[in-house]
A protein has these predicted regions:
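N-terminal "arm"/small-domain region of PLP-dependent enzymes with the aminotransferase-like
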Residues: 41-101, 109
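PLP-dependent enzyme catalytic core of the Aspartate aminotransferase-like
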Residues: 1, 31-32, 40, 159, ...
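Short loop segments at secondary-structure junctions
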Residues: 74, 265-268, 390-393
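Short Gly/Pro-enriched turn/cap motifs at secondary-structure boundaries
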Residues: 59-61, 251, 314, 376-378, ...
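Conserved N-terminal alpha-helix of the aminotransferase class I/II PLP-enzyme fold
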Residues: 79-131, 153-161
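Intrinsically disordered, low-complexity segments enriched in serine/proline and basic residues
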Residues: 5, 9-11, 16-27
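Conserved C-terminal alpha-helix-loop-beta "cap" of PLP-dependent enzymes
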Residues: 336, 344, 348-351, 355-433
């Protein structure tokens, strides 16, 4: 498979730096380009703000400054064998956009870089990302442990849809002790799943605690980092193994595209637990016996998700959606900072209002998760979402919603406009109290 990564080939001229001058730079800051995908430069020593703009795609002389939209389903080859090598996963290249596309891969490379991962894949929605992230290493007869305070759609995915596929899930309190979380594990448990900041309860995850329990039981920790974004938190730095996103939210920021992402840290040792993860460590007969961990190393997990799940299930985002997502990513740090500062002011206002009985926002010093936010989030920031309860209960909430003038009632968060949602009436309507 073809993956957007940095491989040293030839030096390129960029920002007035000649190839001869760049040759004297340390390897960590040398401007280099990839042999297969033009224009990628190593961004490890750059600030996240710079990565949001430059990572994933940097044009060479005479090439477009903006990321091109490769609006094509197929790709030309000159011989039968050339294309055959691609289908056997023995060569790099593109052959069908349902699996991979140059526009999509450039944006995936950027998100992987922002999270500090080794590889990433984009999906057509955040729900598709979470489905693939779990299903890539689970099958009928397996078991998942998940935090109970997660997005309602993800809760139903794990509790209902996966059950139909023969995969059971046990939910644990996010505030549970390590011993209590570990008690939920079974011999067939394959995944521990949680959200960095729970949607919509805004519970802040103790990532190190969950990572320790996961690794003590020989499973990876998958963390949905949608609400925090890599601007505020990078879960890999705290022990998480795989990160997912609904890129529809802050990464897009303008409510113009639906998408998701899965990023692999490359840190989980699948071979050490090969008896559990045989889909990665044993021959895949649908690809002439390829063993993903042997052939693709740290990129085994993402390669399997791309070559197997995308092949069979689809859920690839359109190149145009990825182009729009990339535009959003370029301003992500600026927007997240302003989202958080605005949310902080509103949370403080609501917290002092007589008709508000409770405010959930970890930026408030008295919030239950304030200390965790200070530990895991940059500058203690969390996100631009606030949840609060009115003194009149559900009826008061409905009256409040129906009286809004400027704010919009919508099933969304993290756009440029203020949106208000009543979870009990909308996103979590299928759940009980």
């Amino acid at each position: 498979m073809k993956y957007p990564e940095i491989q040293e080939a030839s030096l390129i001229q960029i920002n007035g730096v000649s190839a001869s001058e760049a040759a004297n730079f340390p390897d960590s800051v040398r401007f280099i380009r990839k042999t297969q995908q033009k224009g990628l430069i190593p961004m490890s020593d750059y600030n996240l703000e710079t990565k949001c703009i430059h990572s994933g795609y940097t044009p060479s002389k005479g090439e477009p400054c903006a990321l091109p939209v490769y609006q094509s389903t197929t790709y030309k080859y000159d011989t039968t064998d050339e294309m055959g090598q691609l289908f056997d996963l023995k060569a790099d290249g593109y052959f069908y956009t349902r699996l991979q596309n140059p526009t999509n891969d450039a944006v995936a490379a950027k998100i992987a870089d922002l999270e500090g991962g080794v590889a990433a894949i984009l999906t057509s929605s955040g729900q598709a990302a979470n489905f693939y992230a779990v299903f890539n290493i689970c099958e009928a007869g397996d078991h998942v442990v998940a935090a109970s305070t997660i997005y309602g759609g993800t809760f139903n995915l794990l509790a209902v849809t996966f059950k139909k596929l023969g995969i059971d899930c046990t939910f644990v309190d996010t505030d549970a002790t390590e011993e209590e979380i570990a008690a939920a594990f079974k011999p067939n448990t394959k995944v521990l799943f949680a959200e960095t900041i729970a949607n919509p309860a805004l519970v802040v995850l103790d990532i190190e605690k969950f990572a320790h329990v996961a690794h003590q039981n020989g499973v990876p920790l998958i963390v949905d980092n949608t609400f925090a974004t890599p601007v505020n938190c990078r879960p890999f730095e705290w022990g998480a193994d795989i990160v997912t996103h609904s890129t529809t939210k802050y990464m897009d920021g303008h409510a113009v595209q639906v998408g998701g992402a899965i990023v692999d840290s490359g840190n989980f040792d699948w071979d050490a637990y090969g008896h559990k993860y045989h889909g990665l460590t044993e021959p895949d007969e649908s690809y002439h016996g390829v063993v993903y961990t042997k052939q693709f190393g740290k990129k085994a997990y993402i390669t399997k998700a791309t070559s197997q799940l995308m092949r069979d299930l689809g859920s690839i985002p359109s190149p145009m959606n990825c182009f729009l997502l990339n535009l959003g990513l370029e301003t992500l740090p600026l927007r997240v900072e302003r989202h958080c500062s605005n949310a902080q002011k509103i949370a403080e206002y609501l917290n002092a209002h007589e008709k508000v009985s409770h405010v959930n926002y970890a930026g408030l010093p008295e919030d239950k998760y304030h200390a965790l936010a200070q530990k895991y989030m940059k500058d203690g920031r969390t996100c631009g979402v606030i949840s609060f309860e009115l003194t009149g209960g559900r009826d008061a909430a409905v009256r409040f919603m129906d009286s809004l003038k400027l704010a919009t009632i919508a099933t969304h968060v993290a756009a440029s406009i203020t949106m208000v949602l009543h979870p009990a009436s909308h996103t979590h309507r299928q759940m009980n109290d």
